[in-house]
């Protein structure tokens, strides 16, 4: 860069820093700029790998949507449990007034430490979210759900009154205000959303999410969660088979897909995922109905192997670490080295 241009740029940067504070503008190559994104595990090994960074990114907005009874709240409660395991603080904005503390406890949530709010209006819910985010003392805030964020005017109005676009305007205004505070405080904010059908759609999917388009733009990660089957033992249904698609991802390559089992009163079955991924990577050998690990038979049938891993957590932890190393850490090291090359090119 020419000397005069360099001087002009330095003067502009110093003026910006005087006016708006140090760090208002910086070079991406500076050592002070963090290139690593912190993540909180989802409680699902496969989903952590599909997200590319080992979980959901902190300092970002995430949207989880799907049909009813697809596992949206279960997944977010697992995120809270993982956050609390790391010593973090979580808040649950229960706009639907449907949080079941006993179910949350079964999934590993420390209910006594969980901050819960049951707001009356959408404005109140989003204002509480903003205050929690600005405190920079909360690691995860869950809003359940966007569809239940009813504007004050609608609550105070008559039943048949028309309030066109009121909720979409509320969401758009709130997200404009929230997004900078979320980044500054490094808080993970998760919005749970429901699916609606667009009328008169001839081509393409008629499905859409509630609350307008603002959340689609502001979300760094969007997850589409679907129930694809039931887990049965004879006639008894033990849980549901679930598929999650990463529809949008600003922090890693998107469009990855994963499947896992959600067991009633237990949550996401980590052991089932370890078995599936272990077999894929040849860490667990499968011969007919028998499964072996390190030349030792560990069970006949998937359910028996799942129980074996549950009773032997050290074996499960060892396998999980091998899977993470194989599928996640190698990928992250490749991404890190390629981004370093990019920054070096920019500096040159």
Swiss-Prot record:
Record-linked Pfam families: RecA, RecA_C
GO terms of molecular function: ATP binding; ATP hydrolysis activity; ATP-dependent DNA damage sensor activity; damaged DNA binding; single-stranded DNA binding
Keywords: ATP-binding, Cytoplasm, DNA damage, DNA recombination, DNA repair, DNA-binding, Nucleotide-binding, SOS response
Superkingdom in the source lineage: Bacteria
Signal peptide: none
Name the record gives this protein: Protein RecA
Classification via NCBIfam families: tigrfam_recA
GO (cellular component) term, any one: cytosol
């Amino acid at each position: 860069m020419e000397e005069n241009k360099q001087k002009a740029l330095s003067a502009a940067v110093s003026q910006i820093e005087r006016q708006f504070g140090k760090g208002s503008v910086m070079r991406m190559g500076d050592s002070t700029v963090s290139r690593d994104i912190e993540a909180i595990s989802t409680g699902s090994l496969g989903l952590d790998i599909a997200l590319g960074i080992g979980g959901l990114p902190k300092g970002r907005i995430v949207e989880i949507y799907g049909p009813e009874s697809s596992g949206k709240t279960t997944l977010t409660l697992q995120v809270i449990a993982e956050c609390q395991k790391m010593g973090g603080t979580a808040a649950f904005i229960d706009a639907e007034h449907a949080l079941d503390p006993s179910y949350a406890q079964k999934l590993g949530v420390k209910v006594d430490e969980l901050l819960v709010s049951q707001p009356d209006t959408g404005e109140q819910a989003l204002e509480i979210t903003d205050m929690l985010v600005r405190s920079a003392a909360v690691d995860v805030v869950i809003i359940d759900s966007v569809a239940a964020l009813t504007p004050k005017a609608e609550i105070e109005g008559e039943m048949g009154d028309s309030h066109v676009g009121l909720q979409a305007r509320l969401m758009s205004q709130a997200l404009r205000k929230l997004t900078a505070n979320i980044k500054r405080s490094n808080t993970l904010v998760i919005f749970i959303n429901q699916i609606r059908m667009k009328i008169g759609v001839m081509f393409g999917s008629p499905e859409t999410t509630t609350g307008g388009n603002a959340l689609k733009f502001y979300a760094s990660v969007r997850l589409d969660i679907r129930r694809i089957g039931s887990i049965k033992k004879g006639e008894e249904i033990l849980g549901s088979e679930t598929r999650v698609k990463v529809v949008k991802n600003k922090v890693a390559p998107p469009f990855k897909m994963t499947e896992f089992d959600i067991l009633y009163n237990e949550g996401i079955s980590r052991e089932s995922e370890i078995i599936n991924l272990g077999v894929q990577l040849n860490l667990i050998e499968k011969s007919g109905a028998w499964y072996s690990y390190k030349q030792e038979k560990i069970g006949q049938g998937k359910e028996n192997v799942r129980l074996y891993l549950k009773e032997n957590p050290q074996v499960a932890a060892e396998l999980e670490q091998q899977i993470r190393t194989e599928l996640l850490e190698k990928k992250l090291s490749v991404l890190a080295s390629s981004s370093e090359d990019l920054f070096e090119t920019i500096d040159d």
